[in-house]
From Swiss-Prot:
UniProt subcellular location: Cell membrane
Gene Ontology cellular-component annotations: plasma membrane
Full protein name: Uncharacterized protein MJ0096
Membrane topology: Multi-pass membrane protein
Transmembrane segments: 21-41, 94-114, 139-159, 164-184, 205-225, 240-260
Keywords: Cell membrane, Membrane, Transmembrane, Transmembrane helix
Disulfide partners: none
Origin: domain of life: Archaea
Length: 262
């Protein structure tokens, strides 16, 4: 099983960057839905068993996520002003999520760097081979962990499946941002300590980081709009799909009219 998984991972590493990003993008969505579903199942199990073994961790995860967002939001509001709620929320989202992207890149790259240092200190061939096997294994585990992102399942555990419509517009760009960040991290690790023979220039890495930021930026600008539409639809009993279709149609028409005016 482990050998087969490593073979698949090596094939993934051998792919070109666009294919890697596309595969990682769909894996991020699959990981999100998986962790969300597991969270919902555990919450259901918790209610049957009259236990807090999932609701309490979910509350903790939500409080950690909220505290992180509030810390960023406070810093942003001091710059843009607390009266501009939309911009404060959007910029807080952008900064918070792009920080997450940078952490993903750093974590994957750092793993390769640390194992490279250990390999340089290794004295025997057997020791080097064992270290390299461990490096490949833990890089795969870290890759899977970043893609599945189990914390998401706990944070969103109180949402219904039908509520996920609210995630789709900004999530489309957000997961492209995260997928690009994961690919950057994987490329960095393979550049530092190669598993497969691939060449990537520093310029390409910088471009990919910029692309990740652009995707997160677009998602950040859409996210407050998505949750406003969601809250409005819930408050007035409007079907979510109809609310989002109408909301984005009007937004699109407004932007088109603004372009023609300019």
């Amino acid at each position: 099983m482990e050998v087969k998984a490593m073979e698949i991972f090596k094939k993934y590493l051998s792919l070109n960057i666009p294919k890697k990003i596309l595969i990682t993008y769909f894996l991020c969505w699959a990981g999100f839905l998986f962790s969300f579903s597991v969270g919902k199942f555990l919450l259901y199990l918790s209610s049957i068993l009259k236990s807090n073994f999932i609701s309490e961790p979910a509350k903790l995860a939500q409080s950690v996520g909220t505290a992180k967002f509030n810390a960023v939001s406070s810093a942003v509001s001091n710059t843009v002003g607390v009266k501009n709620a939309y911009l404060t929320y959007a910029l807080s989202y952008i900064v918070s999520n792009f920080m997450g992207c940078l952490i993903i890149m750093f974590a994957l790259g750092a793993l390769a760097y640390l194992y490279k240092k250990d390999l340089e200190k290794a004295k025997t061939l057997e020791e080097k081979e064992e270290l390299f096997k461990c490096y490949q294994k833990y890089l795969l585990i870290l890759f899977i962990f970043t893609v599945i992102n189990p914390l998401t399942g706990l944070i969103g555990v109180n949402l219904q499946y039908s509520d996920l419509i609210a995630v789709l517009p900004h999530g489309f760009f957000e997961f492209f941002g995260f997928a690009t960040a994961v690919v950057v991290g994987v490329e960095l690790s393979n550049k530092i300590l190669p598993i497969v023979k691939r060449e990537i220039t520093s310029k390409k890495i910088v471009i990919l980081i910029a692309c990740s930021f652009i995707f997160i930026f677009i998602a950040g600008m859409l996210e407050p709009i998505d949750w406003f539409i969601y809250s409005y639809a819930k408050a007035y009993g409007i079907p979510l799909l109809a609310a989002f279709a109408t909301g984005y149609k009007n937004l699109f028409l407004y932007l088109i009219s603004m372009l023609f005016k300019s």
